[in-house]
């Protein structure tokens, strides 16, 4: 019998409601690899559910109370609400119902942990941290919020003592995670339907960092004003800072871009040394910043400079984070998850650094509430794009909000000074736009968290047809 503080191996079948979700599937995969019995349901099958079935999970298509037959515990995400037949069925049967973050915390108790939080950059930073630790021989277990190209999965089962996890702040549950090392990339107003106020959001991140043990460390980006303010509040815990600013402990210097590859040195001011000649095979200052956080932790764990340099140069990236999905007639097609104005601006700046020609941005706004709350920011975040095409809002279950739709955003972009913004209605419209507007050397960047990814992935074949 395992100790009472650890998840018992004989707990019985663990049922995930929405097992194909990017947040749930990684936990399920690690549980399967640890020998636990796992089952789950999703509204439809996917590559993720096929992978889990191949690892031994029982997968149900559709959500019904009878799927719970034999289950010992039910895991839900914050997206699962009362009225879901499996959640209601579990409670009617008296089954334990566990939130996703609580099950992740159970796994984390088996290891020492690095948890990556922040409004933007979590998934990429988690991947960078994982790949550095693999290169350093730590053999970590990884649970990420995106598909890591090196593993073709959002999870990795390692035999080492460390686990690397993405810590999701969207519902406040990241404060339940027992992190040994806490990374904070940035803090912006997002998921305010949960937090309610910027003060509550700040407190949430303060609590996240304060939860680390006395032997842990917080790694924070002081290029971001909110994070620098957070650092100023932290007492009784060790803090390592990173960024481009002259006061950061871990600082990037001599940054240049050649052919979409970042070249830079890393100044370790607290060690009085420099890791020279670093490269990262992706553009974007934000990606270099994310790499600095992983380097800060890697040095804390004792990794050597040459190991760090080699791991950064070999970084394989994450699905839907500036992912090249094709090149047709000299025009590069990029698929990216960016759906917040800060993310969009950073991605388009990276595109400008990587492109020899013009940048054409295609954006599908995600949620009416986000577009409404950040409308002026959306109107100002596309300046690095020569052409902007806006698709219909991906509602994600929300009702429309007056003044926060596709046409309003196009009008807002023009009103804010953009020279070429237009609406598109369909994939056919996108194809016509690209044929009309692009020439060899240009880059088309499709941005959003909804169905725009399918448009991006289908675009190369449409253009070849």
From Swiss-Prot:
Mind telling me what this protein is named? UDP-N-acetylmuramate--L-alanine ligase
Entry EC no(s)? 6.3.2.8
- Any idea which positions bind ATP? 118-124
Q: Which is one GO molecular function term here?
A: UDP-N-acetylmuramate-L-alanine ligase activity
Query: Catalysed reaction(s)?
Result: UDP-N-acetyl-alpha-D-muramate + L-alanine + ATP = UDP-N-acetyl-alpha-D-muramoyl-L-alanine + ADP + phosphate + H(+)
Source species, please? Answer: Ruegeria pomeroyi (strain ATCC 700808 / DSM 15171 / DSS-3)
Print the keywords alphabetically.
Answer: ATP-binding, Cell cycle, Cell division, Cell shape, Cell wall biogenesis/degradation, Cytoplasm, Ligase, Nucleotide-binding, Peptidoglycan synthesis
Q: Per the record, a Pfam family?
A: Mur_ligase
Q: Is Lyase a UniProt keyword of this protein?
A: no
Function field = Cell wall formation.
GO CC annotations on file = cytoplasm
| GO terms of biological process kind | cell division; cell wall organization; peptidoglycan biosynthetic process; regulation of cell shape
Q: Which domain of life is it from?
A: Bacteria
Q: Which protein family is named in the record?
A: Belongs to the MurCDEF family.
Positions the record marks as coiled coil are none
Major localisation: cytoplasm
Q: Does the keyword NADP apply?
A: no
Q: Which InterPro entries match?
A: Mur-like_cat_sf, Mur_ligase_C, Mur_ligase_C_dom_sf, Mur_ligase_cen, Mur_ligase_N, MurCDEF_pg_biosynth, UDP-N-AcMur_Ala_ligase_MurC
This protein's pathway: Cell wall biogenesis; peptidoglycan biosynthesis
Q: Where in the cell is it found?
A: Cytoplasm
């Amino acid at each position: 019998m395992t100790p009472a503080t650890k998840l018992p191996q004989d707990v019985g079948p663990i049922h995930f409601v929405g097992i194909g979700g990017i947040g749930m599937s990684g936990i399920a995969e690690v549980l399967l690899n640890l020998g636990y019995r796992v089952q789950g349901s999703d509204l439809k099958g996917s590559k993720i559910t096929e992978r889990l079935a191949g690892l031994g999970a029982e997968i149900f298509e559709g959500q019904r109370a009878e799927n719970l037959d034999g289950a010992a515990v039910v895991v839900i995400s914050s997206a699962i609400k009362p009225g879901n037949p499996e959640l209601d069925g579990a409670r009617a049967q008296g089954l334990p119902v566990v939130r996703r973050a609580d099950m992740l915390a159970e796994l984390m108790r088996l290891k020492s942990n690095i948890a990556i939080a922040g409004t933007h950059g979590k998934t990429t930073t988690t991947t960078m941290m994982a790949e550095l630790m693999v290169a350093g021989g730590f053999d970590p277990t990884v649970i990420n919020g995106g598909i890591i190209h090196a593993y073709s999965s959002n999870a990795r089962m390692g035999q080492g003592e460390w686990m690397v996890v993405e810590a999701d702040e969207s519902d406040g549950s990241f404060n339940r995670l027992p992190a040994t090392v806490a990374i904070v990339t940035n803090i912006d107003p997002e998921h305010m339907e949960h937090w309610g106020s910027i003060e509550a959001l700040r407190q949430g991140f303060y609590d996240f960092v304060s939860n680390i043990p006395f032997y842990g460390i917080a790694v924070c980006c002081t290029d971001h004003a909110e994070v620098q303010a957070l650092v100023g509040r932290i007492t009784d815990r060790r803090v390592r800072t990173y960024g481009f600013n002259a006061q950061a402990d871990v600082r990037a210097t001599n940054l240049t871009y050649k052919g979409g590859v970042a070249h830079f040195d890393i100044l370790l001011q607290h060690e009085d040394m420099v890791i020279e000649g670093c490269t990262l095979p992706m553009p974007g200052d934000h990606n270099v910043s994310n790499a600095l956080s992983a380097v800060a932790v890697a040095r804390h764990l004792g990794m050597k400079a040459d190991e760090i340099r080699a791991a950064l140069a070999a970084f394989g990236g994450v699905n839907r984070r500036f992912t090249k999905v094709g090149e047709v007639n000299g025009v590069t097609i990029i698929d990216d998850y960016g759906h917040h104005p800060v993310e969009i601006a950073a991605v388009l700046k990276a595109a400008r650094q990587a492109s020899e020609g013009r940048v054409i941005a295609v954006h599908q706004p995600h949620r009416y509430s986000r577009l409404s709350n950040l409308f002026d920011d959306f109107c100002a975040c596309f300046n690095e794009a020569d052409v902007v095409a806006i698709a219909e809002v991906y509602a994600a279950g929300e009702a429309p909000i007056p003044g926060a739709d596709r046409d309003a955003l196009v009008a807002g972009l023009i009103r804010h000074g953009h020279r070429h913004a237009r609406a598109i209605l369909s994939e056919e419209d996108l194809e016509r736009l690209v044929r009309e507007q692009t020439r060899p050397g240009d880059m088309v960047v499709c941005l959003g968290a909804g169905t725009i990814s399918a448009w991006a992935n289908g675009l190369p074949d449409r253009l070849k047809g």
